[in-house]
Structures are given as structure tokens and as C-alpha cells.
Amino acid sequence: MVKGKTKSGIAFELDERIKDDARLMYLLVKMQNATAPIEAGRAMNQLLALIFGDDDAAYAFMEEIASKHNGVCESEVMITELTEMLDAIKAKN
């Protein structure tokens, strides 16, 4: 497990094996290539559940972002936070 904190102060503990999971890349590509917002949203939800282990943990992550940003969890902010977390996993290895 990799523990850390993002620049905005969100604490995380993630399984470092996620970086080797082919589903991660699949879902990132699926999000990027989505032709409709609903497709991108569905892929994002699947990605969050994969990274955090379940829907409840993923939702708690989004709630924490919203609490730091006037009650809104903006997609760009969430992606920035996720990128920092995944970069921390890469840096460990």
C-alpha cells in the first residue's frame, strides 16, 4: 500500500499494484475516447471504483474534494487529485 497526501491535503492509501492493472489503462482510454458525457461519466465511475476498491470509497473521495471546493467536485480537480495519487505510486517504484 502507498500512503500519501495530495497537494490539497487529501490523504490516500492505495494498493500499489493498481499501476500494473490493465483495467486502469482501459478505463482511462475509454474516458478519453468517449463521444458522450454519459460514457465518460460511466468510465470515470468504474475507474474510481477500481482505484479505491468500491463505490463508497470512491464517493467519499468525491465528497472530500467537494468539501474543499465550495460543495462541488469538478472533474478537472478530481483528475488532478487522481494524477497526484497515481504519480505517488509510480514514484515509489
What name fits each language-model region?
Residues R17-N93:
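Short, surface-exposed, charged amphipathic helix/loop patches that serve as local interaction elements
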Residues A11-L14:
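Short, isolated positions in well-ordered beta-strands
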Residues M1-G9:
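Short acidic-hydrophobic surface loop/beta-edge motif
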